[in-house]
Amino acid sequence: MSDFLIGIDLGTSNSAVAYIDRSKGPDALVLDFPIVQPIRPSDVRPQPLLPSALYLQHPNELPVEAYALPWDPAPKQIVGEFARWQGAKVPSRLVTSAKSWLSHGGVDRTAPILPWGAPPDVEKMSPVEASSRLLLHIRNAWNRPNKRAIRAG
């Protein structure tokens, strides 16, 4: 059994993580978990919220070092704050509000439809895939070996 109880709020705009360290017993407190993410080119650090955004960069658009993560030196897409920032410049490559599409009755949530209205040269993903990638990012941030230093900070 894990020493931690973890709660994830996969939000339409932002996602958050809170946890309890069960090894602390009945005095355990609910604590926020800052989520490591790229903020700007080559600036990766923990933030209290993860914008629920993915940016599907063009292969030659940015050097991979600009959005590399401690657990993945060459991510397939940009996640979080940097995704939202870069997507403001190139909105046709930005996936946001993926969670809203999961319950939309007029679309196949497993079909590659996002970014909605993107030109044909932009590789699309499904709302399920986008939500899954956000959750995977959160899982990887939680599982990184030196996360305790961030939480203690």
What are these regions (language model features)?
Residues 2-28:
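Gly/Thr-rich phosphate-binding beta-strand-loop-beta motif of the actin/hexokinase/Hsp70
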Residues 31-153:
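Phosphate-binding loop and its immediate beta->loop->alpha context
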